[in-house]
Amino acid sequence: MADILHRIGIKSTSIEDVYRALTTREGLASWWTSNTHGEGNQVGNIIEFRFGAGGFDIKVTELNPPTHVLWEVAEGPEEWIGTTISFELKQDGDYIIILFKHMNWKEPVEFMHHCSTKWAIFLMSLKSLIETGKGTPDPIDVKIDNWN
C-alpha cells in the first residue's frame, strides 16, 4: 500500500472555518471542484465530486468537529476505489495546520504521481480560500499535464 501525504499551514485563528470548508458543499466547491453535490457534515453521507473528464463519489466515514474528517472513496477511478482521505486539523499559533493523507493506494502507479501534485494544488486552493476568501477550484485550478 502507498499513501499521499501533505502538510500545509493556513494563516487563520478559526479552525471552524477550515473545518466548514471540508464539510459543506459550498466550502468544498470553493476550493476543490465547483461541480460538487452533497454535504459532508454527517457520517454516512455521499459527496459527489465531478471534474472535466470524470469524478468520484466519497462516503463520509468519520467526523470529529473541528479537528478530523475521514472519507472513503466509493465510486470513481479504479485506483481510487477503497482508498481513504484524511484531514487532521490543529491550531498552532496563528496557523491551522492540516495533515492530509490519501491512503491505501494498492500501488504507486503513474496516476498516483499526478494525484499527489493535484492534491498539493487543491490544498493551496483551500489555503487561499481561507486566507483571501477566494480559492481556485476545478475548472479554474492550475493544470499540470494532459490528464486535466
Language-model features, listed with the residues they occupy:
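Hydrophobic pocket/interface hotspot
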Residues: 18-19, 28, 47, 60, ...
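Hydrophobic-ligand binding "helix-grip"
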Residues: 38, 50-97, 103-106
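A conserved amphipathic terminal alpha-helix motif
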Residues: 104-148
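Short structured motifs
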Residues: 4-5, 44, 84-86
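Short coil-to-beta transition motif at edge beta-strands of beta-rich domains
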Residues: 41-47
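Hydrophobic ligand-binding cavity/cleft-lining segments
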Residues: 1-38
